[in-house]
Regions:
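Interhelical loop/hinge segments that connect adjacent transmembrane helices in multipass membrane
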Residues: 1-7, 148, 174-181, 193-230
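Transmembrane-helix boundary and interhelical linker motifs in polytopic inner-membrane proteins
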Residues: 4-5, 33-43, 56-90, 142-149
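Signature of the first transmembrane helix
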Residues: 6-65, 94, 98-102, 161-162, ...
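Residue-level recognition of transmembrane alpha-helices
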Residues: 14, 18, 47-50, 90, ...
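Helix-capping/transition residues at the boundaries of transmembrane alpha-helices
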Residues: 33, 109, 142, 169-172
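Alpha-helical transmembrane segments of multi-pass membrane proteins
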Residues: 55, 99, 113-137, 152-155, ...
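Short membrane-interface helical motifs at transmembrane helix boundaries
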Residues: 96-114
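Hydrophobic alpha-helical transmembrane segments
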Residues: 118, 122, 151-202, 213
């Protein structure tokens, strides 16, 4: 009974933080719509860039947060070894993505139609790399059943993001589209600093054999999900 109560409590916290987060983020839509000039692309620039962000997040994490849960709970592999290996894998993917993205920033910006504002994409590449990496510590918090810590970090990002947007676009009457991406970068970086406790206190190891099994599991899971969608 105690386990059921704990599960119900954690589920409620995760669910509430997600619902509240989505609702608060929707509050930024009218702010952007009014503040961003249509001549510069307006809110369309923000939505277009964030669409690419969502796609790259899926590619970079490649289901490893789910794989971490599966292997950390299988009773065979040492959980902290799984966590460390997953951090190395996703961190490596994110770093490679960021290096290549910044190296070819101007060609990519031109291809996407942002040749005059390449750093819109540059800033969001940094955000994507950090967000993808942060997905693993967030999964680790769920594994540890630290629902309050999980929710507090998620909501802290949202409140900080909304506050800075309101200060610039409403209080200061700003109209620069790029500031929306800069604010996101600042908030994401702040959360990364807040996650330092989840990134220390254990031995960092990269288990090649474990990583191979995890990647196989991810490919198998992705393949099965793909078949369901067809």
């Amino acid at each position: 009974m105690a386990n059921l109560k704990s599960l119900a409590k954690d589920t409620a916290i995760y669910g509430l933080s997600s619902i509240v987060g989505r609702f608060l983020n929707y509050l930024l839509v009218p702010v952007y719509t009014i503040a961003l000039p249509a001549s510069g692309g307006g809110y369309g620039v923000v939505t277009n860039v964030y669409a690419w962000v969502a796609l790259m997040m899926v590619i970079l994490t490649c289901g490893m947060e789910t794989g971490f849960f599966r292997f950390a709970n299988n009773g065979k592999d040492e959980p902290m070894r799984v966590y460390s290996t997953t951090l190395f894998t996703v961190g490596g993917f994110s770093l490679i993505f960021l290096i290549i993205g910044l190296a070819f920033l101007h060609p990519i910006a031109g291809w996407l139609g942002y040749e005059e504002h390449p750093w819109y994409l540059g800033m969001m590449m940094m955000v994507v790399a950090m967000d993808a990496f942060q997905a693993i510590p967030f999964s680790f918090l769920r594994y540890q059943k630290k629902a309050l810590r999980f929710a507090s970090l998620k909501l802290l990002f949202i409140f900080l993001n909304i506050t800075l947007n309101l200060i610039y676009y409403v209080r200061m009457n700003g109209h620069d589209v790029g500031k929306a991406f800069l604010i996101n970068l600042i908030c994401t970086s702040f959360i990364m600093v807040c996650m330092i406790p989840e990134l220390r206190g254990f031995k960092y190891v990269f288990d090649k054999e474990l990583n191979h099994r995890m990647m196989q599991n991810v490919r198998l899971f992705s393949g099965n999900e793909g078949k369901k969608m067809v």
